[in-house]
Amino acid sequence: NLKRDDAGEFICDCSDISEIIAISKDGHYKISKITEKSFFFTDLIYVGVFDRGDTRTVYNAIYKDGKTGVNFAKRFSITSVTKDKEYDITMGTPGSAILWLTANHNGEAESVKIRFKQQKKLKKLIDEYDFSTLAIKGRTSRGNIVSKHTIQSIQLKSLGVSTISGK
């Protein structure tokens, strides 16, 4: 069993030979073998069992670049990685943060409602973003620009259907 902390919050079932993926709020992720005790980043936003040959699991993310403050959206799959090496979902600049992340095991693409922080001359405070308009790329892709304005919150509007054809 995979647990988040000493209190024993159950996350998911796994075996002794499984590998896990841990993603932090600042955009770093690491894939590691299951051990009795493993230490990962602070501020974890996703922990799950990682399957190396899985091409159907698609991650949908919206992140803020730390250097420019521009918000990007991307859909990506993680297929080949080196164990215990740190990778980055964002562009890797200091101050970058993941604002929205979902792991969809069948390639689903959801729609989200984005609320922007109120600023002068900003007329549209609420916008919608549909992940099905994005192509599934590699983890190193930058993504598409969502907005240059500061995002206050993101909420799930609707779950989407799978964008990957059947086997």
Please annotate each region the language model reported:
Residues 1-167:
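C-terminal interaction appendages of subunits in large macromolecular complexes
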